[in-house]
């Protein structure tokens, strides 16, 4: 199989498990050297790197806690060092903003601190990651933000998360216009309910799963690999004419 991303470098945030790991594995399979970030789960990041290397790919992991605003410059210092050692350059071709934490924070339960924590990871971090990446990102590069169907469809148990993801959609559109002269494409991928470790408790509720499946045109919840496939297309040469779009990959959730 032709490796469409051979010679490219990619940064995928929040890739120790779930959708982020699936994206990292897919981009590596397609030939990219992948830097993946993790926060709480070093073991998960190590497993992701090992799986990529076992499949013949190249990857390395960097710790990053995006609640802390000092993390972004530290991340890029470490990324620069690692890429320069490996490639002789800190050039970056693909950026995937995926990092997250628990988004299940109800309206009545939210406090200023918990609101700030969610917004720091889901909104502030992607903004400043892109800002820091631009000096390294090649002309013709790719920025792919992981949004959510919750940005446009009511999810009453996660209003702060929904707010943040709506902001990501808007940021995507603004950046696409801003970076068009450099032929950098900027898109968002908005998953619906997807089978990951992060929502295992919900998946163990058969009634909830049935309700979600009933609201989905294709009649089931998604798999991380299905989100990764959309990201891989946008990262490839074939995706070069798509920019400023939020692509919902939800199996037709709440059509």
Region locations from a protein language model:
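Substrate-binding pocket helix/loop in short-chain dehydrogenase/reductase
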Residues: 106-107, 111-116, 212
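Residue(s) in the substrate-gating loop at a strand-loop-helix junction
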Residues: 148
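Short C-terminal tail/terminal secondary-structure segment
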Residues: 153, 232, 243-255
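Active-site loop immediately N-terminal to the catalytic Tyr-X3-Lys motif
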Residues: 108, 140, 153-159, 181, ...
